[in-house]
Amino acid sequence: TPSAGDSEAPQAGTSATAAKDCFNWGYDPLHFNAPEGSYASDAADGANRIVELRQMVMALHNTGLRVGMDVVYNHTSASGQHAQSVLDRIVPGYYHRLNANGMVERSTCCDNTATENLMMGKLMVDSVELWAKQYHIDSFRFDLMAHQPRAVMETLQRRVNKVTGRHVNLIGEGWNFGEVANGARFVQASQLSLNG
């Protein structure tokens, strides 16, 4: 019988892992759908990353814990023809938000993505659907969610609820700043527009 997630044994395990788990927290996104290698016994083996992450989530669920995932879709680690740029190598200048001079916006301190563009918004929605459906992630915390259009986040919420058959909690930073502040480019998924 699994114990409650807030009971002593699961909490001790969570605390022990948190104390030794020190990595970059994923704020330099490269491949949105690739499981983090540091959680696998062999990070170089892509299939192993997938299998072991699924096993980890299942084990946590079996102890009564739910799994939340921190996601960063507001920027990537690089753009243009940089070695760590992925999206610009597919369609240059489309997946990143550009300023009037054609330069990539960097208000997030990295290369901002343009989820207001149809296919970048779709990439984000499809990615969260994958994590919720295939990995059984229970909730998602969005870094700088106000850099996403409210309409895209609402589409995302409906989609993940539908494919999982349950309500998936979405939590986000609704800060109003940068080139998207005050609805400059779209109605933001911000604290102001979400009445929170």
Residue positions per predicted region:
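Short, solvent-exposed turn/loop segments enriched in Gly/Ser/Thr/Pro and often Arg
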Residues: 1-3, 71-80, 144-149, 172-177
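Hydrophobic faces of well-ordered beta-strands that scaffold small-molecule active sites
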Residues: 67-69, 140, 170-172
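Secondary-structure transition/capping motifs at alpha-helix termini
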Residues: 60-67, 134, 160-167
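Active-site-proximal helices and loops of the catalytic beta/alpha 8
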Residues: 144-196
